[in-house]
Amino acid sequence: RLSLVGSEMCIRDRIETVSKRASKAVGYSWGISEEIGKSIRILEMFNLPGISTLNQYLKKIKNKHPKKLKNILKINKSDDELCPIYTGVRILDNCNQLEDLNVIKFFNINYPLLIIPFLSRSSDIINKPIHVILDQGKYILNCNKTILTNIEKSNNCKISKELTIQFEENKNLFTDTEWKELYKLI
């Protein structure tokens, strides 16, 4: 049995396993549940509230499982609230094609923090930074190595009216001349 004893810090493998099993228990497939487990581990690793956010979201959808997003377009609106997990997996699976859109907008996405690790992993695959702009602030994701934000960790947003994803180009902060001068020193 996996449980947290007292104030003992939960190890990453346990976070991933419990997140995966809880997701499967509310109706996600094993494949999606595995992706959820990895994503919650990433959030916790970056000191973001993955467990508490997933717990709240799974309680919300327990009796009404969300629908999958069929296609991702430049602008994505739905009569229903969008599932951050299905949306995140769809982006992760198609990130090489989606980066050509440069900017993608989603409206009414549930628990937007849950999409962040999928985008962080996508950033690693395409080897480019991704900026995520929400109603309450911004995340900058850099190749699954850093997640920067100006959003308070205690801000547990349950829905984002608008979420914008921007695929950024890699840019050098130095000139060709500076590079050549440095290289000559070798």
Regions found by a protein language model. Give the residues of each.
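Single conserved hydrophobic/aromatic residue that forms the stacking wall/gate
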Residues: 1-10
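Generic N-terminal amphipathic, Lys/Arg-enriched alpha-helix
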Residues: 7, 14-26, 36-39
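Electropositive phosphate-/nucleotide-binding environments in soluble metabolic enzymes
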Residues: 13, 30, 34, 48, ...
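Alpha-helical scaffold segments in soluble metabolic enzymes
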Residues: 18-21, 39-42, 53, 118-121
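N-terminal interaction modules that seed assembly of large macromolecular complexes
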Residues: 28-64
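Glycine-rich, aromatic-bearing surface loops/beta-hairpins
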Residues: 106, 120-186
